[in-house]
Amino acid sequence: MGLEIKGVTIPALMIKLDKSRSFEENLEELEKKLSSAFFQGSVSVVDLSDMELSEDQKEKIESILKKYNSKVLGYRTSDKRSEKRSISNVSEKKSLKIINKTLRSGQRVEYDGDILIIGDVNPDAYVIASGNIIVMGTLRGIVHAGANGDETAVIMALKLKPQQLRIASYLTRSPDEMEEPEYPEKAYIEDNQIYIDKI
């Protein structure tokens, strides 16, 4: 069957290892597929429902993803209660919080980990996470990823139009007259400033 990489809920990717191959063979195929520009700069979920990996093996996967400007958002296992985020530069494992609704003005969500919002973030709504923030809708509110100082955190949205966007200690705002985004975008830190690119 071979190692698979496929879209889950945009903009994340699902990486499913081939249990019929050795871990080293999976790593080789993963790097080969990630070398395609299509997958670079993505956020990924690694499916471990068919096999178990040691912390050292997880770190090797994360190292390859980092090489191609990608990042592990979390690990999916057969036991959903054990799904944990395991990033090599984070000493404490953190989980993914899923919000299945639109956040309206005045609402506030804070979480020590990654936040996935299936809905919009309206103006004057606040989202604060120590990890990544992904919005499956339009982001018009105030967001702060990497709130504990994690400069590798990213913010992604199908339409990125925030009142205020912060990653770690870096801050930016949308222009007053900003055109409607035509594609999903991500915000990240590079060279001590926030960049916004299409996905």
From Swiss-Prot:
Entries under Pfam families matching the protein: MinC_C, MinC_N
Keywords: Cell cycle, Cell division, Septation
GO annotation terms (biological process): cell morphogenesis; division septum assembly; regulation of cell division; regulation of cell septum assembly
Keyword check for Iron: no
Subunit details: Interacts with MinD and FtsZ.
Family membership noted in the UniProt record: Belongs to the MinC family.
Record-linked NCBIfam families: minC (TIGR01222)
Function: Cell division inhibitor that blocks the formation of polar Z ring septums. Rapidly oscillates between the poles of the cell to destabilize FtsZ filaments that have formed before they mature into polar Z rings. Prevents FtsZ polymerization.
Protein name: Probable septum site-determining protein MinC
Native organism: Persephonella marina (strain DSM 14350 / EX-H1)
